[in-house]
């Protein structure tokens, strides 16, 4: 079972601080800014970004959560049986700049599904994508606005993000095709 740690806890902390600064630099009018985390690991990442922005600028940015599982294009797959989670967007996204947050950007299909789900909640001024890891292999024309780390990988390798809130520790691993789930 071959696995390699790509980012440790301190790397993730620094990376999220950098992304928060990039979000602030790009969005001077931060009163129009909201952050929405994609289930599962995008949710704690969204909360951490909002905490960083609060610490750096004293700005409290609204944070929501988005379950996009019913918008996926593989619902008819024999292998996929979604666990429905609670979408919680307790604010209007109309005319807001929505920063959509996910842990890994791979084919772009989850991002497409999340954008479809998000549009059911209103008409944002803009949608920006923040990801901890971009591993390439796009199948759809999707790119992230904020990238923690580009990790070129083989298609059969897996990127595993572990976060304290969901997994008890912070790290990003790359697993070969024989390593399976950790």
From Swiss-Prot:
It catalyses: UMP + diphosphate = 5-phospho-alpha-D-ribose 1-diphosphate + uracil. InterPro entries: PRibTrfase_dom, PRTase-like, PyrR, PyrR_bifunctional. It holds the Pfam family Pribosyltran. CDD domains: PRTases_typeI (cd06223). The keyword Transferase applies. GO terms for molecular function: uracil phosphoribosyltransferase activity. PANTHER family: BIFUNCTIONAL PROTEIN PYRR. HAMAP family: PyrR (MF_01219). Regulates the transcription of the pyrimidine nucleotide (pyr) operon in response to exogenous pyrimidines. Also displays a weak uracil phosphoribosyltransferase activity which is not physiologically significant. NCBIfam families: PRK05205.1-1, PRK05205.1-3, PRK05205.1-5. This is Bifunctional protein PyrR. It comes from Dehalococcoides mccartyi (strain ATCC BAA-2100 / JCM 16839 / KCTC 5957 / BAV1).
């Amino acid at each position: 079972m071959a696995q390699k740690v790509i980012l440790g806890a301190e790397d993730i902390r620094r990376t999220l601080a950098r992304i928060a600064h990039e979000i602030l630099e790009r969005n001077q009018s931060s009163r129009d800014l909201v952050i929405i985390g994609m289930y599962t690991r995008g949710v704690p990442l969204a909360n951490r970004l909002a905490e960083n922005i609060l610490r750096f600028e004293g700005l409290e940015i609204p944070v929501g959560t988005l379950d996009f599982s019913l918008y996926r294009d593989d619902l008819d797959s024999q292998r996929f049986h979604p666990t429905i989670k609670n979408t919680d967007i307790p604010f209007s996204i109309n005319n807001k700049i929505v920063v959509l947050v996910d842990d890994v950007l791979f084919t772009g299909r989850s991002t497409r599904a999340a954008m479809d789900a998000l549009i059911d909640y209103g008409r944002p001024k803009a949608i920006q994508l923040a990801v901890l890891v971009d591993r390439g292999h796009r199948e759809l024309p999707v790119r992230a606005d904020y990238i923690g780390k580009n990790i070129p990988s083989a298609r059969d390798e897996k990127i595993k993000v572990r976060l304290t809130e969901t997994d008890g520790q912070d790290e990003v691993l790359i697993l070969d095709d024989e390593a399976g789930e950790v």
